[in-house]
Amino acid sequence: MARAVGIDLGTTNSVIAVLEGGEPTVIPNAEGSRTTPSVVAFAKNGEVLVGEVAKRQAVTNAERTIRSVKRHMGTNWTIDIDGKKYTPQEISARILMKLKRDAEAYLGEQISDAVITVPAYFNDAQRQATKEAGQIAGLNVLRIINEPTAAALAYGLDKGEKEQTILVFDLGGGTFDVSLLEIGEGIVEVKATSGDTHLGGDDWDQRIVDHLVTTFKNQHGIDLSKDKMAMQRLKEAAERAKIELSSAMETTINLPYITASSEGPLHLEVKLTRSEFQRMTADLLERCKGPFNQAIKDAGITVNQIDHVILVGGSTRMPAVVDLVRELTGGKEPNKGVNPDEVVAVGACLQAGVLKGEVKDVLLLDVTPLSLGIETKGGVFTKLIERNTTIPTRRSEIFTTAEDNQPSVQIQVYQGEREIAAYNKKLGMFELTGLPPAPRGVPQIEVTFDIDANGIVHVSAKDLATGKEQSMTITGGSALPKEEIERMMRDAEAHAEEDRRRREEAEARNQADTLIYQTEKFLRENADKVPAAEKANVETAIANLKKAMEGSDVTAIRSATEQLATESQKLGAAMYAATQAAAGGSSGSATGATGSASGSAGKDDEVVDAEIVDEGEK
């Protein structure tokens, strides 16, 4: 049975984990790192770069480098590269393909099944988009689970039978979630969740970038925000400074040759203290309080009832965030035994193990983060499923017509907490037609909402008089038609094929280069010993291989390489034969010399027959 993996598809970094002998193991990528930057770049030569290599070239290729694409999931955002529009799903799929490829190389086997995590506060469109990204990457997405739930699963499985209340405070690169869970006797139950899908470490970085731009403008009168290459350098420097300020009280941001004026090159050097940084990001920290209080209220508990606090996401390493959590939880010390970067992927792979039957006696009960309902007369949002309802779930309600002889009803589906439908997130709409003429208020239309374990919504409407039914799986917002997903999968496969061809070409060229170098070196060093005929053949083969390398036909390069290898072997054989022949003549005289030596030895018997006699035998 193929193994299933758990993937934390993050805004800034992504992680993949697998169960090895029942124990979760984080899989290092091809570069040897346990986290992979969620960065995708399209090189000028058409090559698609993912991870660390994409991040490294971002400064010189800013316009064709995409980072933090998770923030665009579930929207109509696209990026145009060489006349082709890419959706957030396609860009995310590149990251997933890199994780999948590296994991397959590490494990030595194919991977098809995966559990992928999303922020708890992701709406339906964002979840659907994540599932589609997995499909485009060639993965069978077993389940979409919430990041805080995965973290609690990773933390709580070995904590025994005692029931505990756990708070997961998850501040990642681009999203923020707070979840309250109860863990005990193998059951992980989410009681409440709240969050902000547009708050994360990126926002802290941006404050430093804004500060640097303002400082530089005041000093030199030049606005760096107009220079894409400079902005890319500022972003990287801001991220480094933020990380440094988690352990140091002060850091210096030093960027030589950031731009140039009429007088010559200009350099940026700015000192930033931790207190300054905390001052300029105080409002971001303040935004964390709302979702925290909401989750506590929805769970119907007090902070005193929280047994453990788990910090998830790299941004929770900031001292100000740790202090805030301590303050909000009444002085509780956050758990230090959890790696905030890896715990989500570990939980995801445990859930994959549960679904595959490898992990026994574990039940995961998750919730829907936002209320679901439809628009009714007057633009009112009528909720059918309240937020924090345990999923999977199914709810039905009877509605009627607003006009006499109404031939059809339009069902508009929304997700959110506002009383007026238009202020919530519209997930989609469909129409139930063919209603028989009747006065208003008479027809009975049953609307049913069904949320599966992935948190993805299915809606149906049925006229109870005629039995006519209309249903839909919500594909509003960003969700892609099936044909579009299939096209993107083909594209992704074609790119994988293209990457494989590029790799093969590079390997063939390296092999050819090495052989040419070694052969030419051999010819130079043995110029006086090489037979003329074989030398001419080898030189012709070298010329043919160099000509083949001017093109990009891998078969031609390989064929010419083989030809040169064959001619080199013939040359070696000819040289060996010539050396043997020469050695044969000289070995005859050597034998004569040996014969005379033994002859002379025969004349002196004392030397040959001498024996060592033990003193005791005399």
From Swiss-Prot:
Conditions for induction: By stress conditions e.g. heat shock.
Acidic residues composition-biased segments: 606-618
Domain of life of the organism encoding this protein: Bacteria
Modified residues (Phosphothreonine): 175
Function: Acts as a chaperone.
Region listing for Disordered, in residue ranges: 492-513, 579-618
Keyword Repeat: no
Phylogenetic classification of the source organism: Bacteria, Bacillati, Actinomycetota, Actinomycetes, Acidothermales
Residue stretches of biased makeup (Basic and acidic residues): 492-510
Family to which this protein belongs: Belongs to the heat shock protein 70 family.
CDD domains, per the entry: ASKHA_NBD_HSP70_DnaK-like
Name of the molecule in the record: Chaperone protein DnaK
GO molecular function: ATP binding; ATP-dependent protein folding chaperone; unfolded protein binding
